[in-house]
Amino acid sequence: MSLTANCSFDLSVSDDFVGKRSGYIHIGDSTNNSGWALHSVPITSVKNGKGPRVLVLSGNHGDEYEGQTASLDLARRLEVEDVKGEILIIPVLSILASAAGTRLWPDGTNFNRVFPGKVDGTIAEKLAYFLSHDLFPTCDSVIDQHSGGRSMHFIPSITMVWVSNVELRNEMLRQSLMCKSEFTILGGEQPSTNPDSLLPGDVVRQGKAVATGEFGGSGVTTAQSMAVISSSLENYLRGMGVYVGKDVAASVYADSIDHPGKIIDSRDYSVSFASASADGIYENRVDLHQQVQAGDLVGLIHDFKSADNKVIEVRARRSGIVALVRGYSPVTTGDVVCMIGELFPSIEAFEKSLEEKSAR
């Protein structure tokens, strides 16, 4: 249990408790302007007796506003009669980064790389410790909503890491598909990164399912991205049995797509990612949803300092659908500028492909 962070209302009420409460996760701080200070993160609980407890998270990175907007809207409109069990909502995890319009906290912390946190660490580490030790163990499931932020732009979609635990993987896949998004992107672990240091990785380490999504990017909300994330969140909560209210968002989005449940397989990052090989100004030469072949031109890097130097071409390393493009033009060497995956019309088609490959 954390000794340096606490909730302003009781999180351990009885199963029969009924009520809607809003408050803060308070984290002890001391600054130049306030010797005795609290860093306060908003949290809302809507509980209606016995049932699952589901934790809704967003704002893990400050410049990913789609999830923050959807979660704030959910926290405002949820009433007790909409819920069976408890929905906990932390809409803006990284408040300082969100206010600054940056991915990272002002001190340079990437909140999605500090788990399981430290009880006596920085503010970010204390918050991560509270989540990892006080909240995650008490929840039946967690949804962590992301987007590409300022630097990237995804097809608004549910995403899922292909974890090694088969039983947990199947449950995560089930939860991902219950969101009824048009696209679910399957990926591997991020290269050169400790998966347990990520918020979703810490949930998985504890043997619990986590749902995630990349709902757009470029540091903006769009009508499409908000439709996808709002309906996916509503469908997820309904599928978990904790939301029993009206279809506020899901029915609107359902009318705008031809077929939910398409799968984009980008698990092999060695060929799915295209990266900048030099510093410069990046020009996208493909759009989201576009089909490309291995070797196709996906982007150009222009030299900042000279119009005489030739542009550097960035080419696809595999065939498939473009699932991510660059959202912010300046790039440095190694920045991911495009992601391509193999498109399947359904989970059944994807699973059939896996069976065929394993039989070879």
Language-model features and meaning:
Residues 1-360:
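Structured catalytic-domain cores with a bias toward divalent-metal coordination
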